[in-house]
């Protein structure tokens, strides 16, 4: 695996602490950006979904480098993702939990207290270069104390968006858009 600086959709390096929308690499019917949502019996929006609407940017995500405050974000190195935390959640940090109802490992935020009765995995996320198109990437989750790594894909459970899940095929190919240059909607000049 090559090691490269992670670039946004405008070919600018991604920096820790900056806010970015995670959007599909291919625009159109595949949907829009990622956001938090309530799923199943949850009273708090702690599940990460990809919005169905291709003109919806979702919620910006902030990347940090564990143990380092600055520097460039490089492919294949651990990153932590944070999204604006709802009051009801214990943490804004991305995590992986198993939803027993759909029998899938899903991306969410927070820890055990945010996903009662569900298995929560500890591990790290990395950003890896995707095969297509230019400046596109995939997110990967590696379990702690294991050599097991899985791509982050999508699963549609008819919950107002597609859940981000662990998969070994069909990764969600994404681009990062600097949130400071976009307000979260696409407009036409008409």
Curated annotation (Swiss-Prot):
Inhibits subtilisin-type microbial serine proteases incuding proteinase K, subtilisin BPN', subtilisin Carlsberg and subtilisin E in a non-stoichiometric manner. Weakly inhibits A.oryzae protease and some metalloproteases including pronase E. Does not inhibit trypsin, chymotrypsin, S.griseus alkaline protease or A.lyticus lysyl endopeptidase. CLSI-II has a wider inhibitory specificity than CLSI-III. It comes from the Eukaryota. GO terms for molecular function: serine-type endopeptidase inhibitor activity. InterPro entries: Kunitz_inhibitor_STI-like_sf, Prot_inh_Kunz-lg. GO terms for cellular component: extracellular region. It holds the Pfam family Kunitz_legume. Signal peptide: none annotated. It is found in: Secreted. It comes from Canavalia lineata (Beach bean). Belongs to the protease inhibitor I3 (leguminous Kunitz-type inhibitor) family. Forms active dimers on storage in aqueous solution, possibly through formation of an intermolecular disulfide bond. The N-terminal Asn is removed in about 50% of both the CLSI-II and CLSI-III chains. The keyword Calcium does not apply. The record marks 68-69 as: Reactive bond. Keywords: Disulfide bond, Protease inhibitor, Secreted, Serine protease inhibitor. Disulfide bonds join 44-88, 142-149. This is Subtilisin inhibitor CLSI-II.
């Amino acid at each position: 695996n090559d090691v490269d600086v992670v670039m946004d959709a405008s070919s600018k390096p991604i920096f820790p602490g900056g806010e970015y929308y995670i959007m599909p690499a291919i625009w159109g019917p595949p949907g829009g950006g990622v956001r938090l949502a309530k799923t199943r019996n949850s009273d708090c929006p702690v599940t990460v979904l990809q919005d169905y609407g291709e003109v919806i940017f979702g919620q910006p995500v902030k990347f940090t480098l564990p143990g380092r405050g600055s520097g460039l974000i490089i492919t294949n190195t651990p990153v932590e993702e944070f999204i604006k935390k709802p009051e009801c959640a214990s943490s804004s940090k991305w995590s992986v939990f198993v939803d027993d109802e759909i029998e899938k490992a899903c991306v969410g935020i927070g820890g055990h207290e945010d996903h009662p009765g569900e298995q929560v995995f500890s591990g790290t996320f990395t950003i890896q270069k995707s095969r297509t198109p230019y400046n596109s990437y995939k997110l990967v989750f590696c379990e702690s104390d294991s050599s097991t790594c899985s791509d982050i894909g999508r699963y549609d459970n008819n919950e107002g968006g597609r859940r981000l899940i662990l998969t070994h095929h069909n990764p969600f190919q994404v681009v990062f858009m600097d949130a400071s240059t976009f307000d979260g909607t696409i407009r036409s000049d008409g």
